[in-house]
């Protein structure tokens, strides 16, 4: 096939062998075993056992090498021929001043070489043109038909190839006095393995790569359409070939150069009357060229016509020998000869431009011998790491995928495509033939400097170690002393993708073995030795151009050829992929090649076995014909092995004897011929001491050893006896024989070999007589062992006779071991298998038939007699059944002592086992307190299935099976009751337990069911007890009962009721928590509702707050100082709550005294020794921005706590004069340590109490809430009495009058607002006694910034308040100490309450009016409010922008989907809530029917009934949806109303 025309088809796979560990121990023996199969393929692959994994011993850090450079398309033979052809034709045109540009046809570069070959095969240019077969040429070049490509090919052929072909044919070499080069093949120097490189041919000094690359750059070629459209192109198409065809691919280098050389006139001009040399050109083409008009363009100048005849006669055409028509006479720039343009072949239509050379000069230039092809070394030195990085990067970039993901099939097809392509130049590098002796072997080596581990020592001595295999005893190379690199010393190979090794056979046609240490696979191709000559013939036939210049091309490892091409010509080829850890073996004269799939590391070496010797001799004769150097002397190797025959392996000795015999016969014949020639002189020569180059035949380059012919007069050379006529021309009397051994010494050596070879026959005869007992005498065991030892010591081959001897010895040893066991009683042990009676008789017969005399046969006969006697006794005992169990057991023990298995002993064993099993069944089923388990019963049943059947055994087995089935069924039912999701009522469990009481088996699930039923009954009793008690059950008790009930696998009706009660109680507590607790509060609900137990300890309160900041929440379970049991008594709870109130009041008074004694943070300086306040943040509050708690009198940072807001009144009032009523401003500050909850209003708490009354559960929080409510109402009553006293009422009237004075001159637009605002104020009346104190405020009110000038918004309000601060004066009331003290005490007690009451606010305003305004606090609050206002504005802007973006992004469809989802969720939520509501109503109705109140001793009914009327007196103008409790709590300070 043509390379590259078809897709690559992989050849069949070579044989693959996987030896066992036993076979793997003998490498060369195993190779000899598989040789008949593997040799037919040429190569084979061996996979070692999986555990054989030698360590990689190369020192990676010190490993440096320089690889070879391989250009892939120069490796393939046919591609190289094409490239050489392109070089030659390019050189042809370059000499004539034109550069070659290869045209493109159908978007592919035109294959000029194939076109030339096909034209020649089709009969030549003239014949194809005559028959118009250019379309056939296009078809053979695989171009599609119907596109007129044939005419285009003809144009290219005429323009580029035809002039070169005419030149090559010699048609235009008329009268050219040129002498052809000597074609005699010179001796090609072959470097033996001691030379570093196998590829001895050096690369060309001048790389043709750049020239080829330039040629392959496509230029636009004229198509057929262009030729038809442009007449000038059509005219140029029929021109003859030549360098004048510029623009069609052949361009002159110097367009403007004019060549005109003048030749001196010779003294004599001889005109020869000869015929023109152009007669062999077709007349049609010649006429066509002669009929063309000369070109009118600027061309080379012709010689001018001179009037002198001398000048006319001096210009003579070298072809026609005429000087006429000198205007068409062309002058050569190389030799100064003259030619008519029409005398040239082919003729030229005009004088060409630029430099022109005649055919003689072109011939001289083109006939220079080509330079030999070889590999060049890379310029960069690599380490293993750097080379691997380069290789992996190249492969991944080339295939555009990770290296490990590239299929091997893809790499293989791409490789053969690249080597066959003249268009793509891919260059790779290959670290080949790296000396392991210099760089280190990949296998561990024993003589290395490093200390080897035991594992490494094992691999260092293994026969498969490539450093060991060539020097094994069975190997021939172990008898060569020199370390031949590559043959005895391994070579290393570091490959990358596409790096290749070309077709070759090993030196001396030896074996080779290659091991891939690691890396990606290596692809191999192999050809068997029988087809080696056929492969050489095919390659020479397909590429004769290469072999004409290099006959030994295949020995240089530089040439590839596509396996498909070889297979198409009948060469059998196989392939394989060698993976890491695998061996590949090549057999003698088996051609092989291949390439690497990627980055890998391999090691290879040669070895020679006994069967190689004939092939080695044939190889020497082949080398002699090719005149190739030998690596070693084959004769020397044979003689060296023959000199020490006892050290040879027997197979090797036999093979050496045969080779030695043939060599001696040939030596006698050659010496006889030398004697007949007349050479009589001779002298002994120790050839092995001479260097190889001093004992090589000057004719055939063979290394001489046995003999050589030399000459006294020509001492510089010698010849082998096969070329005695090629030494010199001297007389035979001057020639003499140089010999190593005489003809008498050679037969002696041959005889010693024969003895060694025939020693095996002598030994084999002895073994045959012993094994077949031919003399009638059996040999002893020691005699047979001596024969086997002799074979091992003398290293006889592993023959069939030796195997028979080994088998016989093995049988004898086995018989002796069995006999010793019988006699000594060793087999009586239970772990030793016993012989049967039949086997004992067979053993006796075997011992008698073996060819070995054994005295143990008498012992075997005695044992056989004892066994037969025992057998008779056992039969008698079995015949008299039922016998006593003791007798049977004693007979059984005696039989076991014999060491032989008797059939009757088996029956005795069965009887004993049956009796034992029946006893165990009776004991298990006997009524007793301890019942057997199911496992025991199942074990008995399994044992009963194994023993032999009998009526009693069958009956017991049936009863046991029935009992087990019943027990398992009830166990399954009990398991279902325990594990089922739907729990069963106690009645069902009691029924199951009653049914299983009569089963005599311990049932674990039934027992678990009993325990569960007992627990359920106890749980029901606890529920009844707690439900029937004096009080409602506590929530903790119910939760504990629910948790226990849920874990019980019993269906309990009371559990659902308890779960609902617990759920309702949790719901109430959650609602109460939301009402009281702040977000992320550090207090529990119970702590908030109870009096503060640590009110007097400032450190305790602050530690509580720090625990909240750190997330350390703790629950105080003894807030009231009561145990869990005491909390169940409502009376104890009330008493403890009262005591807690008193402790809280005492504690806060102590804390106020302590904090009041601390220096104020607003003071200019603080004493270091005095105690200071600590804020909740842990720092000391100081400077501006600190606030003092009105309850505990401690100081805090304003930014660390929640502060009151001054702007709490409606906005219209802020722009009017009543703003000066500073005592009504919300400046009261309670720290987070004092204000622990949200402090809901009293009406909210009363709603929680109403819900609590419906709960049939007691909660500690409910008790605490009831106490808190009673405490709050009690305080409210005392506060109302205090506010209703005459003195306080008078003070309240003064404040009311003062407010009226401040509201006297409102703005017109604010009048309506003030009217509504003052109507709702509870402080409406006052006294005129202190009107003068606020007169200044009224007068200065006109100077206040007018509302019109204030910007709207909260910022303007804060500015207004700030502007009013200088105008605030006070106090506005005079509070006597008798009034102030009770009010302050009431204020303190009200602040302790976690409830919001209006009376608290009224008392606060009264106390504020009776003292000067706290300007520092007001300024601090204003600054904090401004800071908060700025942050809120920034957040509001960002929020507004985010909302706008969301509105733009949201679509109508999304809104619909959201609405649908919300509706579905509401529907589900309403369904769930309605279900819960119905359940709550059900249980509430039940509770109402049973008159279940909160507690008998503490009833909410009187308290709630007392406020029932106030709930009904709701303001008729109120728009609230729920009943209001404000009429109950609100105070009226008018004269018409009473408190």
Swiss-Prot record:
Interacts with PCGF6, MSH5, ZMYND8, AR. The gene is KDM5D. InterPro entries: ARID_dom, ARID_dom_sf, JmjC_dom, JmjN, KDM5_C-hel, Lys_sp_deMease-like_dom, Zinc_finger_PHD-type_CS, Znf_C5HC2. The lineage of its organism: Eukaryota, Metazoa, Chordata, Craniata, Vertebrata. Its cofactor is L-ascorbate; Fe(2+). There is a cross-link at residues 205, 229, 244, 272 (Glycyl lysine isopeptide (Lys-Gly) (interchain with G-Cter in SUMO2)). Gene3D superfamilies: ARID DNA-binding domain, Cupin, Zinc/RING finger domain, C3HC4 (zinc finger). Residues 197-210, 1494-1521 have a biased composition (Polar residues). Involved in sensitivity to docetaxel. It comes from Homo sapiens. Expression is highly down-regulated in metastatic prostate tumors. PANTHER family: LYSINE-SPECIFIC DEMETHYLASE, LYSINE-SPECIFIC DEMETHYLASE 5D. 2-oxoglutarate binds at residues 430, 512, 514, 522. It is found in: Nucleus. It catalyses: N(6),N(6),N(6)-trimethyl-L-lysyl(4)-[histone H3] + 3 2-oxoglutarate + 3 O2 = L-lysyl(4)-[histone H3] + 3 formaldehyde + 3 succinate + 3 CO2. Keywords: Chromatin regulator, Dioxygenase, Iron, Isopeptide bond, Metal-binding, Nucleus, Oxidoreductase, Phosphoprotein, Repeat, Transcription, Transcription regulation, Ubl conjugation, Zinc, Zinc-finger. Its EC number is 1.14.11.67. One of its GO terms (molecular function) is histone H3K4 demethylase activity. GO terms for biological process: chromatin remodeling; regulation of androgen receptor signaling pathway; regulation of DNA-templated transcription; T cell antigen processing and presentation. Binds 1 Fe(2+) ion per subunit. One of its GO terms (cellular component) is fibrillar center. This is Lysine-specific demethylase 5D. Residues 1432-1446 have a biased composition (Basic residues). Histone demethylase that specifically demethylates 'Lys-4' of histone H3, thereby playing a central role in histone code. Does not demethylate histone H3 'Lys-9', H3 'Lys-27', H3 'Lys-36', H3 'Lys-79' or H4 'Lys-20'. Demethylates trimethylated and dimethylated but not monomethylated H3 'Lys-4'. May play a role in spermatogenesis. Involved in transcriptional repression of diverse metastasis-associated genes; in this function seems to cooperate with ZMYND8. Suppresses prostate cancer cell invasion.
